[in-house]
């Protein structure tokens, strides 16, 4: 049994040996040579690439801005490279057969061209100022405006690839990188953590308080303005007479009824006046205009001791004369107070240097608005007027008194008379003021010893 086993093992061995002997070259071809394997697996140095047809040759790569036109013919020989055409580029060393096409900025995504395409660089696209890039993919981006952080503060400034990071004020929450009022917050959103109910209650209380207080403030303001207006109107009625006296140099005209009430007896006829026959004067009418005479009887400085009538309080309004009366006046003119002083038998009265009452009477009866004109006509210069006003800046009355005292000192005593003041007041058309001065100086001596009540 052992002998039969041996022939069975020898048969396969013999067949294997025959196959090796018959096809030695075919078996050797199946396994590559060790040297060829090392060459095929070797890598070319940096800046070169393996020849596509001969692995043993390394060709030099083309520079950026060029492309491979033909491979190098052999080792140590140059590669045939050509420059890219317009609208194409290569951005690095390469052995590409064609240049890459230039990219275009997408206006629908808000992109703008930062730098144009060249043979060695692709088009550079970006965003405008105060914008950032939001990438939808690795190379696709869209431009959005940076958030202004309204109702909040900037935590991180806007960058090229990141929007502004905001921190919202109290009563606002962040939604899509914008600070939105808590009134727009719903219970289902996360904003309920930031918008607390207490804040809403406080805000509601403030709004209700403002709603109540605002109408009250407006109402009381209108009431205050109304009271102020009424007070001014009441004051105006009291100031009206004083203002009229200051501006016009005479009292305000009274109503006709009041004027008739003050007329208690008819006027004494003037001996020098003879009216035209048939002329009948009306009640309260004076043939002499009010700008020249008043309603009082004829008066001269020499008659002061015998003057018993009370001081004039009102002056009748000016009334124009009829044609007949005008003819009578032209034929027989009535003298004015200044003419009566000049025609009087008495000599002109000089101002008493030791008695300041005379100067104060002039100060009180000349209108303040006409005062500077008055003292200029007396001979004072503007420099002297300003100096005396500064010396008595707190009291206008004392300043005016000082001006008259200065005029009196520089004027000879025989010339400082009421006649001179009367001429100046006549030139200023202020004869009414002159009569007031006369009454102020002569009135106290003419009062009766036992005063009687006026009705």
From Swiss-Prot:
GO biological process: aortic valve development; cell surface receptor signaling pathway via JAK-STAT; cellular response to mechanical stimulus; cytokine-mediated signaling pathway; defense response to bacterium; extrinsic apoptotic signaling pathway via death domain receptors; inflammatory response; intrinsic apoptotic signaling pathway in response to DNA damage
Glycosylation sites per record: 54, 145, 151, 376
Residue ranges annotated as Cytoplasmic topological domain: 233-455
Ribosomal protein is among the record's keywords: no
Extracellular side: 30-211
Cellular component aspect of the GO annotation: cell surface; extracellular region; extracellular space; Golgi membrane; membrane; membrane raft; plasma membrane; receptor complex
GO molecular function terms attached to this record: signaling receptor activity; tumor necrosis factor binding; tumor necrosis factor receptor activity
Keyword annotations: Amyloidosis, Apoptosis, Cell membrane, Cleavage on pair of basic residues, Disease variant, Disulfide bond, Glycoprotein, Golgi apparatus, Host-virus interaction, Membrane, Receptor, Repeat, Secreted, Signal, Transmembrane, Transmembrane helix
Effect of residue 75 to L: In FPF; benign
UniProt superkingdom: Eukaryota
Domain Death span(s) in chain numbering: 356-441
Region (N-SMase activation domain (NSD)): 338-348
Disease as annotated in the protein's UniProt record: Periodic fever, familial, autosomal dominant: A hereditary periodic fever syndrome characterized by recurrent fever, abdominal pain, localized tender skin lesions and myalgia. Reactive amyloidosis is the main complication and occurs in 25% of cases.
Domain notes: The domain that induces A-SMASE is probably identical to the death domain. The N-SMASE activation domain (NSD) is both necessary and sufficient for activation of N-SMASE.
Subunit structure: Binding of TNF to the extracellular domain leads to homotrimerization. The aggregated death domains provide a novel molecular interface that interacts specifically with the death domain of TRADD. Various TRADD-interacting proteins such as TRAFS, RIPK1 and possibly FADD, are recruited to the complex by their association with TRADD. This complex activates at least two distinct signaling cascades, apoptosis and NF-kappa-B signaling. Interacts with BAG4, BABAM2, FEM1B, GRB2, SQSTM1 and TRPC4AP. Interacts directly with NOL3 (via CARD domain); inhibits TNF-signaling pathway.
Protein name (Swiss-Prot/TrEMBL): Tumor necrosis factor receptor superfamily member 1A
Species in which this protein is naturally found: Homo sapiens
């Amino acid at each position: 049994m052992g002998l039969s086993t041996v022939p069975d093992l020898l048969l396969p061995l013999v067949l294997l040996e025959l196959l090796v002997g018959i096809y030695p070259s075919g078996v050797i071809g199946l396994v590559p040579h060790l040297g060829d394997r090392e060459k095929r697996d070797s890598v070319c140095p940096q800046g070169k690439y393996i020849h596509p047809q001969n692995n043993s040759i390394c060709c030099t790569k083309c520079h950026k801005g060029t492309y491979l036109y033909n491979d190098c013919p052999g080792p140590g020989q140059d590669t045939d490279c050509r420059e890219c055409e317009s609208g194409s580029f290569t951005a690095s060393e390469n052995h590409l057969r064609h240049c890459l096409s230039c990219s275009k900025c997408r206006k629908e995504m808000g992109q703008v061209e930062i730098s144009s395409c060249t043979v060695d660089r692709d088009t550079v696209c970006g965003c405008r100022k105060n914008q950032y890039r939001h990438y939808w993919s690795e190379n696709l981006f869209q431009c959005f405006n940076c958030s202004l952080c309204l109702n909040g503060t900037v935590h991180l400034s806007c960058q090229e690839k990141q929007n502004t990071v905001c921190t919202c004020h109290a009563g606002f929450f962040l939604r899509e990188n914008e600070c939105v009022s808590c009134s727009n917050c719903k219970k289902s959103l996360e904003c309920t953590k930031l918008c607390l109910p207490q804040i809403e209650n406080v805000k509601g209380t403030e709004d209700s308080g403002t709603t109540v207080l605002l109408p009250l403030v407006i109402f009381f303001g209108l009431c205050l303005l109304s009271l102020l207006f009424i007070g001014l109107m009441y004051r105006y009625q009291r100031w009206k007479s004083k203002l009229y006296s200051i501006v016009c140099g005479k009292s305000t005209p009274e109503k006709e009824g009041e004027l008739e009430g003050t007329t208690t007896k008819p006027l004494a006829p003037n001996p020098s006046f003879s009216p035209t026959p048939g002329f009948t004067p009306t009640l309260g009418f004076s043939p002499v205009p009010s700008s020249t005479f008043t309603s009082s009887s004829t008066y001269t400085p020499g008659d002061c001791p015998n003057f018993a009538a009370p001081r004039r309080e009102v002056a009748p309004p000016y009334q124009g004369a009829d044609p007949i009366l005008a003819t009578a006046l032209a034929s027989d003119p009535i003298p004015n107070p200044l003419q009566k002083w000049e025609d009087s038998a008495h000599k002109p009265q000089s101002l008493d240097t030791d008695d300041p009452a005379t100067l104060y009477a002039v100060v009180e009866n000349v209108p303040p608005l006409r005062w500077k004109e008055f003292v200029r006509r007396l001979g004072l210069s503007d420099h002297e007027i300003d100096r005396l006003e500064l010396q008595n800046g707190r009291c206008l009355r004392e300043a005016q008194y000082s001006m008259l005292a200065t005029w009196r000192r520089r004027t000879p005593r025989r010339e400082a008379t009421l006649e001179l003041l009367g001429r100046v007041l006549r030139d200023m058309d202020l004869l009414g003021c002159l009569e007031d001065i006369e009454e102020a100086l002569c009135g106290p001596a003419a009062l009766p010893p036992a005063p009687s009540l006026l009705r």
